């Protein structure tokens, strides 16, 4: 796959946008998913979902990235002042400096190194826990949307824990969770018109984005497959148990 095309797919289907996109697409194919919300009230709800699960975490990532770059810049000059040679500093901090170079090319929301993912993932987990509390316990609509928020929150927490030890594709995880949720939803509501094609499109998107992550070199095959298995399992289980 062409790398520019792979980057476009990875950006459009960013993991933090998936919960909102999933609820929106399910509403379009089956409006009863957000009963008793209808029409304008649903879109007000959807905007809040995108804010809580997408916009706020993305802003947090940007702020963390800016702070991260500023910190390394100060560290660089501090080491030079302390008479550490430039060559020595670059050799010791090569992975981090490569990361900065990539981000200065416009990839502000990518985290190529496993160790630099842990703290942002932890903070995003906290935001998702708050979102889950808000949408499940304070402003619950029905058991289906509750299951979606619980599944996505559990996945973010699990990915954070796994990332301490191994790198895993969160793109593959969230999109395969969407596949699992879609399959599970179809089990309980099998009479929805054209639902087979809806699920087929989600499966195709999941496959395309997973391929894109491999094409970009962001993950290897094991990391993508691990994400696919984890996401699908949690998503399907959430819908079965809801």
Task: Indicate residue ranges for each PLM-predicted region.
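Short, Lys/Arg-rich, polar N-terminal cytosolic tail immediately upstream
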Residues: 1-6
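Loop-to-helix transition at the N-terminal end of transmembrane alpha-helices
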Residues: 37-56
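C-terminal ends of transmembrane helices
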Residues: 60-78, 96-111, 156-168, 207-219
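Juxtamembrane helix-capping/reentrant segments at transmembrane boundaries
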Residues: 75-85, 107-123
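Membrane-embedded catalytic cores of phosphoryl/pyrophosphoryl-handling enzymes
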Residues: 137-139, 144-242
């Amino acid at each position: 796959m062409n790398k520019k095309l792979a980057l476009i797919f990875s950006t459009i289907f960013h993991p933090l946008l998936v919960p909102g996109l999933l609820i929106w697409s399910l509403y379009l194919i089956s409006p009863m998913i957000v009963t008793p919300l209808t029409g304008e009230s649903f879109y007000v709800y959807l905007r809040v979902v995108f804010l809580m699960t997408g916009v706020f975490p993305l802003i947090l990532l940007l702020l963390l990235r800016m702070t991260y770059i500023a910190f390394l810049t100060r560290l660089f000059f501090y080491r030079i002042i302390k008479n550490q040679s430039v060559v020595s500093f670059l050799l010791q901090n090569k992975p981090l400096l490569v990361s900065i170079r990539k981000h200065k090319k416009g990839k502000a929301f990518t985290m190529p190194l496993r160790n630099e993912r842990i703290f942002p993932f932890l903070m995003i987990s906290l935001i998702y826990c708050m979102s889950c509390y808000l949408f499940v316990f304070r402003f619950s609509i029905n058991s289906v949307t509750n299951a979606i928020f619980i599944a996505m929150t559990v996945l973010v927490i699990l990915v954070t824990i796994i990332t301490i030890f191994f790198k895993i594709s969160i793109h593959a995880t969230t999109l395969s969770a969407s596949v699992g949720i879609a399959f599970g939803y179809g089990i309980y509501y099998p009479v929805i018109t054209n639902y087979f094609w809806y699920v087929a499109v989600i499966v195709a998107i999941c496959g395309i984005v997973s391929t894109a992550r491999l094409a970009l070199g962001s993950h290897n095959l094991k990391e993508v497959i691990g994400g696919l298995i984890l996401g699908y399992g949690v998503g399907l289980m959430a819908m079965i148990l809801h």
